[in-house]
C-alpha cells in the first residue's frame, strides 16, 4: 500500500500540481492525521512529495490552497444538500467539479479558486428543515 500511495501522490502533483502528504490513523481508526510535522510549510515540488515518509502512510491527504494550485473543498455533511449544490453549480460552471465520498459518508466537492486562496470557514445552515454543517476547507488545511 505505501508504494501505491507514493505513486498516487506523485501522479497528483505531476498532473494537477496538488501537494499530497502521508497520513496516519486518528483515534477513530480513520487515516486523517498528517505524519509529517510542519506539513503546512512544505514546498510544493515533486522532490518534496517523493521525500515524505510514505512507508509509514495509512492514507493520503491533499494540502489545500496556495500549495496545491488554489485547490479548495466544500465539505457538506448532508447528501441531499450536496446534490442540490451540485445541480445549482452544474448550470453555472464551465466544468464539472470533482466529487469524493468521505470515510464518514459525507461529500467533498473539489474546486479551484480563481482569484486567490480563501481562509477556511464553517457555517451551520438550515436545509429541508434540519441543520447541516457546510465547511469551506481551503488555504492551510488538508483533506483525506
PLM region spans:
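Conserved phosphate/metal-binding and DNA-contacting active-site motifs used
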Residues: 1-144
